[in-house]
Amino acid sequence: MAPDLASQRHSESFPSVNSRPNVILPGREGRREGLPPGGGTRGSLVPTRPVPPSPAPLGTSPYSWSRSGPGRGGGAGSSRVPRGVPGPAVCAPGSLLHHASPTQTMAAADGSLFDNPRTFSRRPPAQASRQAKATKRKYQASSEAPPAKRRNETSFLPAKKTSVKETQRTFKGNAQKMFSPKKHSVSTSDRNQEERQCIKTSSLFKNNPDIPELHRPVVKQVQEKVFTSAAFHELGLHPHLISTINTVLKMSSMTSVQKQSIPVLLEGRDALVRSQTGSGKTLAYCIPVVQSLQAMESKIQRSDGPYALVLVPTRELALQSFDTVQKLLKPFTWIVPGVLMGGEKRKSEKARLRKGINILISTPGRLVDHIKSTKNIHFSRLRWLVFDEADRILDLGFEKDITVILNAVNAECQKRQNVLLSATLTEGVTRLADISLHDPVSISVLDKSHDQLNPKDKAVQEVCPPPAGDKLDSFAIPESLKQHVTVVPSKLRLVCLAAFILQKCKFEEDQKMVVFFSSCELVEFHYSLFLQTLLSSSGAPASGQLPSASMRLKFLRLHGGMEQEERTAVFQEFSHSRRGVLLCTDVAARGLDLPQVTWIVQYNAPSSPAEYIHRIGRTARIGCHGSSLLILAPSEAEYVNSLASHKINVSEIKMEDILCVLTRDDCFKGKRWGAQKSHAVGPQEIRERATVLQTVFEDYVHSSERRVSWAKKALQSFIQAYATYPRELKHIFHVRSLHLGHVAKSFGLRDAPRNLSALTRKKRKAHVKRPDLHKKTQSKHSLAEILRSEYSSGMEADIAKVKKQNAPGEPGGRPLQHSLQPTPCFGRGKTLKWRKTQKGVQRDSKTSQKV
């Protein structure tokens, strides 16, 4: 056999991997130049136009081929050409056998495709050529071969130096794996493993500090007996007043503080009253005031001015005290009560003072304002001066205002009766008592000796100064109040608070909760966050809202930065509602009687044990049951011992017990728990559901730049408030003990922000000593001269141009005034100027009338 013929057969029997067989479409015979159309030599293209075959059986193609050989793709009518040595070709009935060259084999095997009208329809030449190229690529590669280009898997290992031989061996091994077909079976366990890796819980539950065990000493709390068996008719009050107390206020028996205070005050003695929160101190001074004023021989006239002055620290407490006095005065219509507080119109308050107010209830700041600016206010007939929540008045920095008020009262009225009331006795209250009270009687329900005190006795019990600070002081707590504490890492504070709110207010009936924060910015941030994520205003949840939102959730906010009308509306709405969550600052921590409050949550720890007592005192009032929860960080766990030193006993609630409520809501399910029931849960599912809730918060915060900036400002406010703890608590609450990245997580931020001080820094204008001189000496063309350098003429197109402001009245300019009308005034430059003319106004009015 000739060598050239042997090589031809060898190439035909063993095509190389890189050989590309030519696919020739019907009617496009490939001929070399100079060859006859019917024949050819080696290397020439054989025409593939078929001879009309003999009639074939129905359902068979004239080009049906059956090929046996290794690999998938062999079979009747197969259009795939396996790599390797092709098997012998078998001719089907009614078909024509050509030369077994790769080109002819491919052309014959494509007959089934050509007969399909869907595959090959009449197309433009360009589209047909693209289809032919696609067919080439389809038949060229094996069905099992992976794509030629693959992404290299990202490796997190350090680079390793390899030799040339190792590189070649690696390439050969990869090539064998690439070209060897391998069948992959996907099992259910692999799918679960992939879904399990989709949920990431490391950001919340990793790198957290260890939660310490609380070694709280068991202390015996100071208890007060709230109610007594004594009735109001035993005090010798007016019958109409007793009837009003029984019917309107629905009270028949007195509390302990009322039983001891009312007789002393009816005798005309000054008193310092100290009692626990919710014990009825407001009625303890309101009843004697009303009884003494209605019993005066000369009937009180409205124009007489104030006979009683009551000072309260907050506006909400002023409204509450005014409402109580107004109810007691229903039988005595000639006595007129009134209230003065910030946020109201001064003009209307001056009009009421001009008409006359007999019982005046006011905040210190607004009263000082009227003393300095209103001539119609006078205290010549004043008989009563009451300081309600005296410790809070001093805490808010009203010492100077109290001094101004006392000087104004002492200048017009020397003889009066003074009363101080507070739940805690501090050093500031003692100083105020020394200044304002005259031979006072100390009334404390904690002291058992007060029962033996006879009000008719002329002996006066002097006020004993309390210990320095609150270190050795003890506080009375209602017996029906249960106190709890939980230690939560900083990253989980937000999720833990949301889970606790859902647990109490969504899955339980008629729950009313008050959550205390340390600043107004924190209240606003959490209010908007919970309102948009936990609560759905409509039936279908909006974007970013959880579908599990229930109508039982009702969020309200109250802080000092709100308008007075809104504060009053929120206070009234929360007082009359059966359920809801009130997010507030310490503005609601003193004296407010919020009925049916079941839970008090302190998201930020109070600055003193006295503040802690006033916060939890919003629940369990007048014998009702209530509970409180204090949320602490692991570094703040020692605060429990500080509370125990003041005889405050708290019990611990585990963080896992709070987060497990998320398993009761199906909207917090992760991917791997989609088919499982909620009752069979474990710690991993609780973590994943907490991560889902945290993701909802973070998505809401990062949905816009404004919300991210808002969260950063709230974080800055938290840090500033954290730095204001007193020196006695600095070893527990110190800024250096905070992890800013973890704390930022509790505000929905994914990273710890930088330059927090730049967020609230106000831009200050540069101070120029002589601005007029600067304007005169400034050249008009100074900017153009600066732009021109020694290498440029200043005429290039890329030089920045000064943006001219549009003239008034033009699009983009400021609105045109009525007195400014365009009047043509051509000077040297022949430019249109603006001139004030009365004629222009008249012409404009005439034109508008014509239109």
Swiss-Prot record:
Domain Helicase C-terminal positions: 480-659
Domain Helicase ATP-binding as annotated: residue spans: 262-443
Motif stretch (Q motif): 230-259
CDD domains in the cross-refs: DEADc_DDX31 (cd17949), SF2_C_DEAD (cd18787)
One cellular-component annotation, GO: nucleus
Biased composition (Basic and acidic residues): 841-851
Domain of life the protein comes from: Eukaryota
Keyword rRNA processing: no
Assembly with partners or alone: Interacts with NPM1; this interaction prevents interaction between NPM1 and HDM2.
Family per similarity comment: Belongs to the DEAD box helicase family. DDX31/DBP7 subfamily.
PANTHER family reported in the protein's UniProt record: RNA HELICASE
Protein name: ATP-dependent DNA helicase DDX31
Organism: Homo sapiens (Human)
